[in-house]
Amino acid sequence: MNRKHFLRILSAALLPALLSACAAQRPELYAMRNGGSHQPFYFTDRYGELAFREFYDWAGQFVGDRAVVERDGKWGYIDRSGETVVPFRYDWAGSFGQYGFDEEVAMVKTGMDRDRIPLYTPCPTALIDRDG
């Protein structure tokens, strides 16, 4: 068997495995909003179908199995089924893995003036793990 045929057979055998590995790393749910800034956020699958019937004032994309969401001025985290896994008790929250932290840690703030920039507001700040 010459080298050309060997490479064809090898790429035919490995390509499906590589493509499925790449597809598995893509997010399965997406935070979406229709229209202007006053419309609620919701989550869809990759085909645009509504994933669950929860709507949020703001929503971030999933990082692993958690997404940061805001409802009625408080921030918390949901899992991929839409269940609240970290209660809506923070005045601001970042996504897991944001601001240079690894994907197991997120920054949250309490006692924050809502008219200020969250990252630079002097107020009680904490790092939480995926369970809050």
Give residue spans per PLM region.
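N-terminal export leaders
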Residues: 3-7
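Homeobox/homeodomain signature
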Residues: 8-9, 118
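Bacterial N-terminal signal peptides
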Residues: 11-20
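Residue-level detector of conserved, function-critical positions
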Residues: 23-132
